[in-house]
Regions:
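Rossmann-like dinucleotide-binding domain that binds NAD(P)(H)
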Residues: 199-290, 297-301, 360
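Redox-cofactor binding/interface segments in oxidoreductases and associated redox assembly factors
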Residues: 25, 103-107, 148
Length: 420
């Protein structure tokens, strides 16, 4: 007997007028300042932007949290907005029934208390949680768009399984960091088809937790080069003096590194080499010849990011600027892109292949650093090719935060979400 193929979930009422698309929020934890707060709270109470406070076009109707501690705000926010907190992922997607009953899923598998791998990487149970989401789709014979925050999974094999399973079930996916949706100073976006020969990106923090942000920022720029994305042939992860040696020997372009750092307005005063106790870098060779370096320079750069590239023999650079606390409006622009992805039932300004590639680069880079003594790792499995989507990303074009990006936050009645 021929089985019915997967089909798009059909709402009981129209998504184009009668009501807002219903969203299930699946998250590790929901505490002040975590990604569930910075994304979910904006979808509950309003999206602060340079152009004012924007009312959400989607409605979170169900919530599931893996860990609930004394700082939890998720239960209270859900109750204030008539969203039910469910005991299982399946219940949150079916609203306690037997079949899929929401129009989209936002999955935030970040933060919380989880063990580390032998590589020193936090083993967030993303594949486990997403498999449970896919299982509901498979049982229901229907799918809806899924957004996965930051990255698909902590390991390449898990990420590839998630990607392949989503493709098998026809699930539209969007994944990634908020960095591609930050304001850029100066304003810089490569025209599609640009000839980029070398590029460097810099950021702070540890490679494990912050490297993915730097990679996502970098990839959203270089994927616009001539021929589109073609994938990566090798990755090398180095740290400590090996990073300084790579700069001195020309394996990392000092000119591009200096330009990327020069574009960053808020960095520590003094010598980079004296301030950074543990520099880390990924040296990336792309299949089409592009040579790239991703550096984490904690101590010199702190929650700041820069990018520079050689484009048609000219060096250009920019800073990707986070919006100030407590609004963190760069998440607002990520939310606007997620919302459009849901409303258009799968049109994404952040191709999931971008995130799959950055996941693989990061995992192989850390493996090179920890297991291979900094040697080059060949990556034929990262032959991931795609073209930048023709859906323009929504990101702020003003040079500095303005309007509601600097306004009152949180809204009246939600003061409890600010951690004292």
């Amino acid at each position: 007997m021929m089985r019915e193929i997967m089909k798009k979930h059909q709402s009981t009422t129209s998504m184009d007028g009668d009501r807002k698309p219903r969203v299930a929020l699946i998250t590790n934890i929901y505490e002040p300042g975590v990604h569930a707060d910075k994304i979910g709270t904006k979808l509950f109470v309003g999206i602060p932007t340079d152009d004012g406070m924007i009312s959400p076009d989607v409605k979170i109707v169900s919530v599931w949290m893996d860990q609930v501690g004394p700082k939890d705000i998720g239960n209270r926010i859900a109750a204030l907005n008539d969203a039910k907190v469910y005991p299982t992922i399946a219940d949150a997607l079916t609203l306690g029934g037997d079949k899929l009953a929401v129009d989209a899923v936002i999955y935030i598998g970040e933060h919380g208390s989880y063990p580390q791998s032998r590589l020193g990487v936090t083993m967030y149970p993303r594949m486990n949680h997403l498999e449970q989401i896919f299982r509901v789709f498979d049982h229901s014979g229907e799918y809806v768009p899924v957004f996965s925050d930051k990255y698909l999974a902590y390991s390449w094999l898990d990420s590839k399984w998630i990607y392949d399973r989503a493709k098998e079930l026809n699930v539209p996916m969007m994944a990634g960091s908020s960095l591609p949706f930050c304001r850029r100073s100066p304003l810089l976006e490569h025209p599609l088809g640009s000839e980029i020969s070398k590029a460097v990106a810099v950021g702070g923090g540890e490679m494990d937790s912050y490297g993915i942000h730097t990679l996502e920022m970098f990839q959203c720029m270089v994927e616009r080069r001539k021929g589109g994305e073609t994938g990566v042939s090798s990755v090398q992860g180095i740290e400590g003096d090996a990073v300084w040696n790579a700069i001195d020997q020309g394996d990392i372009s000092k000119e591009l590194l200096d330009l990327a750092c020069q574009k960053i307005g808020n960095k520590s005063e003094g010598s980079m080499r004296k301030l950074v106790a543990k520099p880390q870098a990924l040296l990336i060779q792309y299949n089409d010849g592009l040579k790239a370096a991703i550096l984490t320079l904690d101590g010199y750069l702190n929650s700041t990011w820069g990018y520079a590239a050689t484009v048609e023999d000219k060096m250009v650079g920019t800073e990707f600027k986070l919006s100030p606390a407590p609004v963190f409006a760069h998440f607002s622009y990520q939310v606007l892109n997620i919302q459009r992805f849901i409303e258009t039932e799968g049109k994404s300004s952040a191709p999931v292949e971008r995130n799959l590639l950055t996941n693989g680069i990061l995992d192989m880079g850390i493996r090179s650093m920890v297991l291979e003594d900094g040697n080059i790792v060949k990556t034929p499995f990262l032959n991931i090719d795609y073209s930048a989507e023709d859906v323009d990303a929504i990101w702020p074009k003003n040079p500095e935060s303005t309007g509601q990006s600097l306004g009152q936050w949180p809204p009246e009645g939600y003061e409890f979400i600010i951690e004292e």
